[in-house]
UniProtKB/Swiss-Prot annotation:
Gene Ontology annotations for the cellular component aspect, listed alphabetically: plasma membrane
PROSITE patterns listed in its UniProt record: PROKAR_LIPOPROTEIN
Matching Pfam families: SdiA-regulated (PF06977)
Membrane as UniProt keyword: yes
Family: Belongs to the YjiK family.
Keywords for this protein: Cell membrane, Membrane, Transmembrane, Transmembrane helix
Protein name, UniProt field: Uncharacterized protein YjiK
Compartment annotation: Cell membrane
Bilayer topology: Single-pass membrane protein
InterPro entries named in the record: 6-blade_b-propeller_TolB-like, YjiK/CarP
Species this chain originates from: Escherichia coli O157:H7
Segments passing through the bilayer: 5-25
């Protein structure tokens, strides 16, 4: 009798393990399917005029150009969607520039990883920068190199998501930043507890699907997640996947344009573009 019970328990364990394996495979298959139509059409192009420290990326619908940052010395970089440099704009009020997000009408939100400061700025065609607003999100008393690395913005409801890189990954949801009052900052614990990535190095909001694109250079992956944190797509950033000839070693910024093209920048100065064979 005892042997029979042991056998039944053993059999149940095998069935449970098999079900878990099948479900895991199904989830992975579904995740891959989210990006299955994408291929690299620009594969690790060096950005001429930038030598190192490229970090973060955003697309401007106003100019149909991309804006990136160099963290040290703090500099905003504008380039074409082909990865060609247009101009550089030095900033003298930021210590460690890490994120940039276009919010419309020549305005951007940037963050300083060194002191957790967030700026709303305007940038005109003459490369003149004006600070419109500054706030701080106190992550911890002693600044580290694990501050904000990802920033996503929904123009639909003017919500920002600021992603702390790691140790641990944290997500701060900010509303009211673009108004003169009603500023609200909260930890998005529902979103952050779902992450399986080793770190967050960049982020982007996809208004077409109301989802977030979250980049990880340590995991060498790009995930698409719902605002509740459910993973619905994953792209491997390794050699042989999605037309890549080499691993993207240190992916630092992610942007998407209104045609669904995905742009990634990686240190020291590399540019990637992924294009879908059909609209998403």
């Amino acid at each position: 009798m005892k042997k029979r019970i042991t056998f039944i328990v053993f059999l149940c364990a095998i069935v449970a393990a098999s079900l878990f394996f099948v479900q895991s495979c199904v989830r992975k298959s579904q995740h891959v399917a989210g990006f299955q139509n994408y291929q690299a059409t620009i594969d690790g192009k060096e950005i001429t005029g930038v030598t190192k420290n490229i970090s973060s990326l955003t697309w401007s619908a106003q100019s149909n150009t991309l804006f990136s940052t160099i963290n040290k010395p703090a500099t905003i970089v504008e380039m074409t969607t082909e990865g060609d440099l247009i101009r550089t704009i030095p900033l003298d009020f930021v210590k460690d520039l890490e994120t940039i997000e276009y919010i419309g009408d020549n305005k951007f939100v940037i963050s300083d990883e060194r002191d957790y400061a967030i700026y709303v700025i305007s940038l005109n065609a003459d490369s003149e920068v004006s600070i419109l607003k500054k706030i701080k999100i106190p992550l911890q008393e002693t600044p580290t190199n694990c501050g904000f690395e990802g920033l996503a913005y929904s123009s639909q409801d003017h919500t920002f998501w600021f992603f702390k890189e790691k140790n641990p990954i944290e997500v701060y949801k900010v509303t009211g930043l673009l108004r003169s009052d009603e500023l609200h900052i909260s930890k998005d614990k529902t979103l952050q507890r779902q992450f399986t990535l080793d770190d967050v190095s960049g982020a982007e909001f996809n208004p077409q699907k109301n989802t977030l694109l979250v980049l990880s250079h340590e995991s060498r992956a790009l995930q698409e997640v719902t605002v509740r944190g459910d993973v619905i797509g994953e792209m491997s950033l390794t050699k042989g996947k999605y037309g890549l000839s080499h691993n993207i070693k240190q992916a630092e910024g992610i942007a998407m344009d209104d045609s669904g093209n995905i742009y990634i920048v990686g240190e020291p100065n590399l540019f990637y573009r992924f294009t879908s064979t059909k609209s998403r």
